Amino acid sequence: MHTKTLKELSALLHSKQISATELAQLFLDRIAQSDLNAFLHVDPALTLKEAALADQRLASGDTTVLTGIPIAHKDIFVTRDWRSTAGSKMLENYVSPFDATVVEQFKQAGMVHLGKLNCDEFAMGSSNENSYFGAVKNPWDKAAIPGGSSGGSAAAIAARLTPASTATDTGGSIRQPAALCGVTGIKPTYGSVSRFGMIAFASSLDQGGPIAKTAEDCGLLLNAMTGFDPRDSTSIERDKEDFTRDLNQPLQGLKIGLPREYFGAGLAADVEQAVRAALKEYEKLGATLVDISLPKTELSIPTYYVIAPAEASSNLSRFDGVRYGYRAKDYTDLSDMYRKTRAEGFGEEVKRRILVGAYVLSHGYYDAYYLQAQKIRRLIAQDFQQAFTQCDVIMGPVCPTVAWDLGDKADDPIANYLADIFTLSTSLAGLPGMSIPCGFGQGEKNSKRPVGLQIIGNYFAEAKLLNVAHQYQQATDWHLRQPAE
């Protein structure tokens, strides 16, 4: 049962072959037996209460395709009645008085909430080792990282602890863990999914999206997640669309752009081999490969690591111990309380980024760093628009290597940042991008570690990306592979 797709589970629920309560209990049992640290907060009583409501809806016929199906939320989305920690000591015991819009949308669809998923603190990280509550283990090899910041979301899908999960992507945090855990994830166009109730890291980059087993599953989840929200000032007003409408379109005549910058030095041989094999499969499906250039790719890391920390330093200034969250125990005056609360409440990586952000926004450095980074960001977006005059979608690796061992890069933040080289540009441009499993590379002691293929589209081309991914998944079985229990 735990290996079935959302469509298969929906058919079983609607034909009364299984109840929402039975399905929820099945996944709760799997979560209880897991040692991956993917979940931060599980409350079986709350889950089973929601499952009972879903069963009532199924009995009355007031349903959607998602009614009764379990889902778990990245602990960046606030949830009423559940702790919302953002993986930080600062919010260790925080319970939100309201649900994030995304959580609300899935409740309205009748989905059943299984629990909150582990992530890097305030979504800052590429390995899920920055969580105050401990690292998440990769289900394919427990010595390896799952990727970040949505490591819990990807690991939980790979280990079949939930059939659906929410995640967020600021610079690659949906695509990279999906790739390293061998599952499917999509970051939609910036502004497509409401950020209301999504704990902010970098507001001009943060975007919610789903992680699941298949492209079709992601499309069904995206149908519920997207839509205009007046409570989010960056939400885009567009008609609702069915992202699964074009899944079965043939790929004959599709032009796939291959950026030469994505296949150069630094790309591991086993990753390149898996990606090239996937591209050959696309040629068999009728697609044509086109050589393109994204010349500003190498500037994406310095650009991102100026803009994102600048926005984070502003967003995280609200966590000061006054209104909610952690407060230092011993202090002499208000300034001392601010200082100690933030020093004790934030982890090392978060403090590092706040310092960088405050520096690049400070008098005398704003023009030299922040303003320059925004100019480069615009040029990166222009590179993509130029590329899309030559091709329909862009493909390449998600990450230069397979998942590395836990602790390998823990003391080297720059090495972690470099792992995002292929995902940052898409985020800076606000484009949709996804990762699908396309093979395995070599880990330590000959372990198999997944490789992801990145597919990037033009603005609002999610249906096209899902079609391109689905056709590949119909021809291959990488997305069906799962780690040993």
Curated annotation (Swiss-Prot):
Known EC number: 6.3.5.7
GO cellular component: glutamyl-tRNA(Gln) amidotransferase complex
Protein name per the record: Glutamyl-tRNA(Gln) amidotransferase subunit A
GO molecular function, one term: glutaminyl-tRNA synthase (glutamine-hydrolyzing) activity
Pfam families membership: Amidase
Role played: Allows the formation of correctly charged Gln-tRNA(Gln) through the transamidation of misacylated Glu-tRNA(Gln) in organisms which lack glutaminyl-tRNA synthetase. The reaction takes place in the presence of glutamine and ATP through an activated gamma-phospho-Glu-tRNA(Gln).
Record field: catalytic activity: L-glutamyl-tRNA(Gln) + L-glutamine + ATP + H2O = L-glutaminyl-tRNA(Gln) + L-glutamate + ADP + phosphate + H(+)
Top class in the EC scheme: ligase
Keyword set includes Transmembrane helix: no
